Amino acid sequence: MKKTLIFIVFILTLNAEAFAKETTYKKELFDKAASDGKVVIVSSWIKYCTSCASQMKILKKAKNEGELSDIKFDNIEYFSFDVTNKEIADLFDVQYQTTLLIFKDNKEVYRSIGETTKDLIYEALKASI
């Protein structure tokens, strides 16, 4: 019984993370960040996707908690969008949730689908700076 309750709480926690997503991508903000010479990260998600939530959590933790002390996050802009938003998905040629894009000098320098390994995401960030 105790294991069942723990499992239910775990599943509810994952679903709570899946609901915590919002579209932050705005074309004018993306264009301004790119023209200001910032590295721009764009991630796609879909409702109920726990992998998407994990990926977003890694990116937010890196920025908000300074996990990557050798990266200056004031030169990085992070946006996310719901992959069902066809206009944005088509703009970036994104077909799947958990697509992670990194742009530098207004050019795409990194693309992955489904990557939720913290070390690999951090490695991609470091390589893009």
Regions found by a protein language model. Name each.
Residues 4-5, 10, 18-37, 126-129:
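N-terminal leader/targeting and pre-domain segments
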Residues 35-47:
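Short active-site neighborhood of thiol/selenol oxidoreductases, capturing the structured segment around
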Residues 53-68:
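Typically the conserved alpha-helix immediately C-terminal to a functionally engaged Cys/Sec
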